[in-house]
Amino acid sequence: MSRAASVAATLPGAMPHPIEVEGLTKRFGKFVANDAVSFSVRPGETYGLLGPNGAGKTTLIRMLTTLLPPTSGSARIDGHDVVSERSAVRRAIGTVSQAQTTDENLTVRENLSVQGKMYGLSGRLLRDRIGQRLRQVGLWERRNQLTRHLSGGMRRRLEIARGVLHAPRILFLDEPTTGLDPQSRRAIWDMFGELRADAPLLSIILTTHAMEEADFLCGRVAIMDQGRILCEDSPDALKRALATGERVELETDRPIVQEDRLAIAEEGAANLRFASPTRVQFEARPGESTGRRVARLLEGAGYHIVHLSIALVTLEDVFFAHTGRALRDT
């Protein structure tokens, strides 16, 4: 939890939740894209929606940003209803979508100037705000460059600068680092820290299918699948709730037969999964040496262990525990 969110949490009634969602549902014919989704976001909090493509994350964001009317349920953004007070909601929010929204035939500065004027900024205030945001995202030196000449990572940074140019109280980030290389992705993550320092009470909703991104950026995370929120808490609390602390992966030189699979389960391996005929994954409590016991069991049965790794539980393990499948496989 961020410092601002921590302070807000100790002052009940002093700072209402800027985002409140209750039973929000969206149907397209017989298909239910979002099914009675409920949650709230505190002032200064970064709240993550983690799930695979098709989980309903983007549909939910489109409803919260007034681009799509809900079938039922309600949502209030900065105290305003997303259906009956759409103009007020739009004034309070900033958005960064998956798609590129900047004009590639304008310069970096011109793109921000157009955005600022749409929100009523002008004159010195607009010039100062453009300079501030471009420095924050590391694009000041490229302010006069045509947008079409920017790299993918730079374009994403420009999109984020546009989203926060008018100093919104709430920011929606829909898959902000999709398609970026690891170095560009980490640069975006670091940039969020700088933006957060400048606006400690800014509330952020971040959608992502990258568990590392949710773990790094979010104070709380909701695991989404098939239009529903399955669980919600801080990343650390979600991982602790598995009652396990280590993720074990083991690979043998030949397929593991059913009899030996049952023997592995009897060794206390939690959330047991056979990723392939020769590769087994499971979770275990720290210090119990379950991984090494399973390795010895298989070696005693005549298998040769070609790979054994033991790591900490991740949010992907949380997703698997709630859905029975891996996040990367969806």
Regions found by a protein language model. Name each.
Residues 73-81, 89:
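Conserved ABC transporter NBD signature motif
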Residues 167:
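Conserved catalytic motifs of ABC-family nucleotide-binding domains
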Residues 171-174:
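Catalytic Walker B motif of ABC-type/P-loop ATPase nucleotide-binding domains
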Residues 191-285:
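ABC transporter nucleotide-binding domain
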